[in-house]
């Protein structure tokens, strides 16, 4: 069996990239419902739901891009330094695509 690097998995995983991008736009800390709500407002990103955020969370935690904090029953997603750096770059790329190239989905 061939091992696929986390980099390739991240590029293929649009939900993981979406969660990172939305967390960066939400100041690096948010609950799952806040991430889903922010995703619905953009209308250009893939649609998220609780299961998709949970699947993305597993990958992002494993690769140290986010950390999970618990406040009672709520799970708070927090970007790590690596995740914040990657989120900032993704945000710059998305702004370039939307504003300068005027691409639409």
Region spans (language model):
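Short alpha-helical segments that sit at the start of domains
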Residues: 1-26
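Amphipathic alpha-helical dimerization/coiled-coil segments
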Residues: 3, 84-105
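DNA-binding alpha-helical recognition surfaces that contact promoter or target DNA
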Residues: 21, 37, 55
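Short amphipathic alpha-helical interaction segments
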Residues: 46-63
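A short, conserved structural fragment
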Residues: 61-71
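Basic, amphipathic "hinge/linker" alpha-helix immediately C-terminal to the N-terminal HTH DNA-binding motif
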Residues: 72-90
